[in-house]
Each structure stands twice: as C-alpha cells, then as structure tokens.
Curated annotation (Swiss-Prot):
It holds the Pfam family RF3_C. Disulfide bonds: none annotated. The lineage of its organism: Bacteria, Pseudomonadati, Pseudomonadota, Gammaproteobacteria, Lysobacterales. This is Peptide chain release factor 3. One of its GO terms (biological process) is regulation of translational termination. One of its GO terms (cellular component) is cytosol. Residues 9-278 form the tr-type G domain. The keyword Metal-binding does not apply.
Length: 534
C-alpha cells in the first residue's frame, strides 16, 4: 500500500448534526475528551461560566451559548485520526451546515430523548439523503425522563425514513437509569454517579448472566430488561455494514453526553465502522482519495478567527494525495499558482501550522480575499469539485450606517463576512445600497454584532423591497445585454461578481421570467463553475 492509501484508510471525517439544544456541542466536547484532545470539558450552559465549550469559540457564541459557525477539530483515537466538524445547531445557519456536510464522509445525528425527531433534524437529514451520507444516531440526555426507546426508534424510522439498528439499549432512564446493554458484544455498562465512564473508570459486566449484575440493577429491572430486549431484537434490524455505508440504515446508541455516559461505545463503534475518505466527483472525472497528487476544495471561509490578527481562513478538505507545508498548488478558478506556506490544522480555535495533511483532513489556508467557497486546489490539473451550492437567500435587508464616514469599513466588513457563506452581499446596479441576504433573522444580528466587534462599524439593517434573488445566465451575449438594459433597476452584482435579479415580488419575478425566455434564472449557484471576474 502507498503512504497515501495507508494514511487515507486511517481517517474518519464526520460532522455532528442535530436540532438546537439536543446536546451536540456537549457531545463534541466529550468525544474530544475521550480522544485525549482536551483535559477538561466545558459545559455550554452557563453563559458567564469561566470555561466555555471548546468548539464554541467566537465571542458571540460564547455570549449566547449557541454554535453559530462550524468548527473543525482533529484528534487521534485507537490508531485512527478523527476529523470532527461541528455544525451550527441554530436554524438560521443551514447553509453553513449544508456545506460542511459536503466535506465529510459520514455524520452523527444527536436526538434529545425527550423531544425525539425535531424539525431541524428532518431538514438536515434531507441534506444527508442527497449525498447518501452514512449516519449514526446518538439518543442523548438519558439521565432525564424521555420517550419510550422503542417509540423513538419507530419515530426515527417513520419520520426520517431510515432503518434503525440499535447497538446499545438503555436500562431505565431518568431517575431509574442503571446503564446500557451493548447488543452486539453483550456487555453491560453500568451508570454510576460521579464516574468518568472511560473504559478504565466504569463498571462493565461481560453479559446479562454475569454474577453480581442482579445486585446492581435489581431482579425486577433485569426481568423487565430481558423482556424488552426480546421484543427489540425481534422487531428491529441487526446492524448491516453495507446498508449503513449506503445511507439506508443508522446504528443507534443511547447515552448522556453531559455525564460522559454511553459515549465511548459510540466512539469505538464509529472508528471501526465509519467509512474512510471516499471518491469525489469533479467537473471532469472522479477523484480517488488514494491518488498520489493533492486535490482539495474549500467548503467554508471564516473571518477573524484570531481577533489579534484580523485574518481570514479558508477551510479546505483534502480529497486526494498528500499536502506538505510550502507546496505549490494551482488555484483552479484563477489559474494562478499559489504557495500554501502557513496552512493550519485545528483543535477548535487552537491552531497549529500543518506540516502535512492527508485525504479526509481539513486544513486552513490564509485568505486575502482571493479564495471563495467551492474553490479547488490541485497540483496542476484543471478540475473543479461539484456539489457545493450557494442558495438564494429568503430575507433581505439594507445596511445603513450610523456614522456615514465609515462606509469603506462597512463595505469591507460586509464583503468579508459574506465570504463565509452564511450571508450574501449584493450591490444593485442602479443605486448605492448595500443589501445583505440571509436565510434567517439571527444572521442579521450576528453580522451587526460582528461588524461592531471586529470592524468597529455601527450599522443597522432595515427592510428593503426585495423578496427573492435569482442568478441570471444567458448563452446569447446580445440577449443578456438587452435583458440587462431593460431590467437594470432590479439587477445587482453578488460578491463573486455574478449578475443577480433582485425581485421585489414573486409576481415580478414570474413576469421577468416570462418576458425573457432565453435567460436562465437559478435559485442556487454551483460554486464549481464560477469563474473570477476581474
């Protein structure tokens, strides 16, 4: 096996998805704790608490206790290298999450035992479906009262349309929680207050028949458990690796992230069965991870990861080959050679200079405004990874300055923050307005907060008469020019220099489409095909 094949086979790159407050960030912390990446897990709850969760590193996230931007963390575990991408749980940040899901090989879905499948989980699941992403499920907060576990499996199967294969099963819950049974190994992991629940610090019985177990959980509970397990094993599906990897079956685990309980069986199973880096489609051909030459794509851009340095970092997923510090690459969109000198690896916000990276790894590239989401880097081959879209925003606001002298900083701030992809920035052709588009209201708050915090600009966002946006294309240059002249009042340019129709109403959009049958109006923009406009 080549060095690239060897290293690629060790990688497990995944994202955690959930509805807000299902305990995703807490679980992230615990996985890092087991991976030896952090010594002391910080709880997300107390906003003024001294320890903040490692993956919520932006000032606003620390203040509000919600994850707003996806973090990237890497840790070694059992001979494998795990790359964990945390995604925002808040509904308004769907696009950021969507793009993170394009950069992973599998996902972990976290469900609150009391709430079951929630609306945001359904949406994220649809995204995973588009790519047949393999999914494992962790049913969290077992230390609280919740729904019947059998009903929960039924709910996941019915609502999300995916087969469940329970791997661990709870022994009671809430006040009566006694532990979990591992349905494949037969082991019983006891739940005891004050334990860390590492392999070294937990009571594990080899089976339900093991002497001493009945004293721990009581005869009645053991009898109930045996009955329940008979029912579960009769009604549910055994784990099937091929069905899981095809995105048709989800292995299910139960536990309590905040208490570390049930997390290690999940992590052990994950590193053993989750897929290593997979082949990727490009505009020209399929790229296999084991190819010798480097290729990768940018799925996220983050401004100001380090307030002291006012920097912007492009997150690149390595798809094939080996990255080494200082290597020369081709930035396909611009056609320029770029030397990747100080690329970073991540442990949430702690960055280290990357000496090398392999397929499945995520590295950070310093970006001075020349790199966009969806950009491909190669060792010279001209190809572009596909399937990384920009969506048309659903809400629009005009930015207004309280201090008109800060216009330059405002333009710079809006352009840089929109590069991250959670908001989009438009400039109408016929006015000096600066219009911001987003998927949800929270994003405008975040931008206003960050403009003030990071750029020293006090701006307010007020309503503007734009209902929706469509990217416009036409193969006939003359017809496009005619369309541009007739509709100049409704046209604008986005941050990538693409022409966009900003429709004041849905009816207006319909009429414009009818009047210009040769012009294509699209609700998404595929990043792979965007060429830079000078």
């Amino acid at each position: 096996m080549s060095e690239v094949s060897n290293e690629a086979a060790r990688r497990r790159t995944f994202a955690i998805i959930s509805h807000p407050d299902a305990g995703k960030t807490t679980l992230t912390e615990k996985l890092l704790l087991f991976g030896g990446a952090i010594q002391m897990a910080g709880s997300v709850k107390g906003r003024k608490a001294a320890r903040h969760a490692t993956s919520d590193w932006m000032a606003l996230e620390k203040e509000r206790g919600i994850s707003v931007t996806s973090s990237v963390m890497q840790f070694p575990y059992e001979g494998k290298i795990v790359n964990l991408l945390d995604t925002p749980g808040h509904a308004d940040f769907g696009e950021d999450t969507y793009r993170v899901l394009t950069a992973v090989d599998s996902a972990l879905m976290v469900i609150d035992v009391a709430k079951g499948v929630e609306e945001r989980t359904i949406k994220l699941m649809e995204v995973c479906r588009l790519r047949d992403t393999p999914i494992m499920t962790f049913i969290n907060k077992l230390d609280r009262e919740g729904k019947n576990p059998i009903d929960l499996l039924d709910e996941v199967e019915t609502v999300l349309g995916i087969q469940c294969a329970p791997v661990t099963w709870p022994i009671g819950m809430g006040q009566r929680l006694k532990g979990v049974v591992h349905l494949i190994s037969g082991e019983v992991h006891l739940y005891e207050q004050g334990r860390n629940f590492t392999r070294q610090d937990s009571t594990i019985f080899p089976s339900l028949e093991a002497p001493g177990l009945v004293e721990k959980i009581g005869e009645q509970m053991l009898a109930e458990l045996r009955e329940e397990l008979e029912l579960v094993q009769g009604a549910s599906n055994p784990f099937d690796l091929d069905a899981y990897r095809a995105g048709q079956q989800t292995p299910v685990f139960f536990g309590s992230g905040v208490n570390n309980f049930g997390v290690q069986p999940l992590l052990d199973f994950f590193v053993e069965h989750a897929p290593p880096p997979q082949a990727r489609e490009t505009t020209g051909r399929r790229v296999e991870p084991t190819e010798a030459k480097l290729s990768g794509f940018v799925f996220k851009i983050q401004a100001n990861m380090d307030p002291q340095h006012r920097d912007r970092v492009a997150f690149m997923r390595v798809c094939s080959g080996k990255f080494t510090a200082g290597m020369k690459t081709l930035h396909v969109r611009s056609g320029k050679d770029v030397k990747l000198a100080n690329a970073l690896t991540f442990m949430a916000s702690d960055r280290e200079i990357a000496a090398e990276a392999w397929p499945g790894d995520v590295i950070g590239i310093h970006n001075h405004g020349t790199i966009s989401i969806g950009d491909t880097f190669t060792e010279g081959e001209s190809l572009s990874f596909t399937g990384i879209p920009n969506f048309a925003p659903e809400l629009f606001r005009r930015a207004r300055l309280r201090d008109p002298l800060k216009l330059k900083q405002l333009q710079k701030g809006l352009a840089q923050l929109s590069e991250e992809g959670a908001t989009q920035f438009f400039r109408p052709l016929m006015s000096n307005d600066l219009i911001l588009g987003a998927v949800g209201v929270l994003q405008f708050d975040v931008v206003a907060y960050r403009l003030k915090d990071e750029y020293g600009v006090d701006a307010i966002f007020e309503p503007v008469s734009v209902t929706t946006a469509r990217w416009v294309h036409c193969d006939n240059a003359k017809k496009l020019e005619e369309f541009r002249e007739k509709n100049a009042g409704n046209l604008g340019i986005d941050a990538a220099g693409q022409l966009v129709y900003l429709a004041p109403t849905r009816v207006n959009l319909q009429l414009a489409q009818e009047r210009a049958p040769d012009v294509r109006f699209s609700a998404t923009r595929e990043h792979a095909h965007v060429k830079a406009i000078d």
